[in-house]
UniProtKB/Swiss-Prot annotation:
It comes from Bacteroides fragilis (strain ATCC 25285 / DSM 2151 / CCUG 4856 / JCM 11019 / LMG 10263 / NCTC 9343 / Onslow / VPI 2553 / EN-2). It catalyses: Cleavage of non-reducing alpha-(1->3)-N-acetylgalactosamine residues from human blood group A and AB mucin glycoproteins, Forssman hapten and blood group A lacto series glycolipids. Keywords: Glycosidase, Hydrolase, NAD. This is Alpha-N-acetylgalactosaminidase. Its cofactor is NAD(+).
Length: 425
C-alpha cells in the first residue's frame, strides 16, 4: 500500500559505486552460471554466497578459489539468505532461486538497503508485483529483473530502429517463449532438472502463461511501455494439455505416476494485450511440444516489419513485400547496430564468451551502477511483465475474458518519456 510520502522511482539513480559488492542467493544450475559470468566483469567484488544445499555452496566457493579470487563467505540453511542480506558490506543481491521465492527475498534485501537483481519472472502474483513496487519506492533501491532477452543483438537492433522511426508508427508486436523442456521437467536435479521438480509442480497446479517475460520484455521496450504508453488489458486462451502426458507415457510407461498425473497447464498459451494507445501485443508460451526454439520477436509498423524467428527477417518500404537478404540484411543490421552490441557485444566475441546477451546485460548493469545511471529495466518493468503470469491464468479460467492490467506507476507513465537503452551515457 502506498504511503503519503511514497513517490515513483522512474529514472532512479544512485551515487556512483566505484566497486560493486555482490552477493548471490541460489547456486543451482542458473545461479552458478551467473556467478561464473561475473568473474568476467570488471569493477565487482563477490562478498558472499548463499545456497540451501551445502554441497552446491562448497562447489561455488571452489570455483572462485580456483579462478584466483578470494573465497567469499558462505551461508546455508533456510534463513541463511536473511543473515547474508543483513550485512552492511553488500551493494547488490542476485536472486537465482525458484520462482516462488523471488519476491520475498527481493523485498527483504531492499528493506536492508540492497539493490536487487532477480531472475525471471520477478513475481508470480499481482500482489507480489505490488510488493516489489512499493518496497522499491519506499526504500529507493534498484529492483531489476534479469531479462537477458532484452539484450539479444537482433532485439537491440530493432529497438534502435524503432527509436529512430525506421518502422514508422509501431502498431503490433509479438513475442514468445517456445522451448521444448520436457526432458528437463522430468529430469532429476543431478541431470539438469529443477530442484524438487518445482517447474513440473507448477504445471500441475496452474495454467495461463507462467513465463511471459522472455518474449514480452523486448517488445515492451519497443513500445516504450510505462514511458508514454502502458498495457491496458489482456485476453488469454490455452490449448488442452497433451505434451507432458505423452512424454511421460513414452519414457516412463502408461501406468507410471508421471503418466497418470493430471497437468493443468495447457500445451500452448496465447495472450493478447492492448495498450492504452491502441497498440496490440501477442505473447505465446509452449515448453512441451517437439518444435524448434522461438521467441518470435515480431515488430509491425506503418513503414516496415521485423521478425527474428525462425530466421532473422527485416522488410521495409518501398519493397516490404520481400525481406532483405544476404548483404542487404547484413548492411541494415550493421547500420542500426545498437551501442550496447557495438561495445559490450563486441567484447564478448573478442573474449569468446558463450552467451553474448548475458554478458551485455551484466556489463550494462554494472556500468550503470558504477556511473550513477538509471538502470535499463526498473521495478515497473519487473512488475508489468511478471503480472501476466497471474492475469493470463485468470483469463483462461474464466472463458478468456478481458482482464485489466494494473498501472504500477500510478499514473507516472503519462509524464515519463525516457528513451531507454539508447545511449551509453
Amino acid at each position: 500500500m502506498k504511503t503519503p510520502s511514497q513517490t515513483h522511482v522512474l529514472g532512479l539513480a544512485h551515487p556512483p559505486l566505484p566497486m560493486v559488492r555482490l552477493a548471490f542467493i541460489g547456486l543451482g544450475n542458473r545461479g552458478v552460471l551467473t556467478l561464473q559470468r561475473y568473474l568476467q566483469i570488471e569493477g565487482v567484488e563477490i562478498k558472499a554466497l548463499c545456497e540451501i544445499r551445502e554441497g552446491n555452496l562448497v562447489k561455488a566457493q571452489k570455483i572462485l578459489r580456483e579462478a584466483g579470487y578470494p573465497q567469499p563467505d558462505g551461508y546455508t540453511g533456510p534463513d541463511g539468505w536473511k543473515r547474508m542480506c543483513e550485512r552492511d558490506d553488500i551493494d547488490l543481491v542476485f536472486i537465482c532461486t525458484d520462482w516462488l521465492t523471488h519476491t520475498p527475498m527481493a523485498v527483504y534485501s531492499m528493506e536492508h538497503g540492497k539493490h536487487v537483481a532477480i531472475e525471471v519472472p520477478a513475481a508470480m502474483t499481482v500482489e507480489e508485483c505490488w510488493k516489489l513496487v512499493d518496497t522499491a519506492e519506499k526504500t529507493r533501491q534498484h529492483c531489476m529483473m534479469l531479462e537477458n532477452c532484452c539484450y539479444d543483438p537482433f532485439a537491440l537492433t530493432t529497438l534502435n530502429m524503432a527509436q529512430q522511426g525506421v518502422f514508422g508508427e509501431i502498431t503490433h508486436v509479438e513475442g514468445a517463449y517456445i522451448h521444448d523442456l520436457r526432458s528437463i521437467y522430468f529430469a532429476d536435479e543431478s541431470k539438469g532438472g529443477f530442484h524438487n521438480h518445482w517447474g513440473k509442480k507448477y504445471s500441475i497446479e496452474h495454467t495461463g502463461n507462467p513465463y511471459p517475460t522472455h518474449g514480452l520484455g523486448p517488445v515492451c521496450q519497443i513500445l516504450n511501455i510505462h514511458r508514454g504508453d502502458r498495457m491496458n488489458y489482456l485476453v488469454s486462451l490455452s490449448s488442452l494439455q497433451a505434451g507432458m502426458t505423452e512424454y511421460a507415457r513414452k519414457n516412463f510407461g502408461a501406468d507410471s505416476p508421471e503418466a497418470r498425473q493430471k497437468y493443468l497447464l495447457g500445451d500452448m498459451n496465447t495472450t493478447l494485450i492492448q495498450t492504452v494507445k491502441g497498440k496490440s501485443i501477442m505473447i505465446q508460451y509452449n515448453v512441451v511440444t517437439p518444435r524448434p526454439y522461438s521467441r518470435l520477436h515480431t515488430v509491425c509498423g506503418t513503414k516496415g516489419f521485423a521478425q527474428k524467428y525462425p530466421v532473422p527477417s527485416i522488410a521495409l518500404e518501398p519493397d516490404a513485400g520481400s525481406p532483405l537478404e544476404g548483404k542487404a540484411l547484413e548492411e541494415i543490421m550493421e547500420r542500426y547496430k545498437h551501442p550496447f552490441t557495438a561495445t559490450f557485444g563486441t567484447e564478448a566475441h573478442r573474449r569468446n564468451l558463450p552467451n553474448e546477451m548475458n554478458y551485455v546485460m551484466d556489463c550494462r548493469l554494472i556500468y550503470c551502477l558504477r556511473n550513477g545511471l538509471p538502470l535499463d529495466m526498473d521495478v515497473y518493468d519487473a512488475a508489468e511483465w511478471s503480472c501476466i503470469t497471474e492475469l493470463s491464468e485468470q483469463s483462461v479460467l474464466n472463458g478468456s475474458i478481458p482482464v485489466e492490467i494494473p498501472d504500477f506507476t500510478r499514473g507516472a507513465w503519462k509524464k515519463c518519456h525516457i528513451s531507454r537503452t539508447s545511449d551509453l551515457y
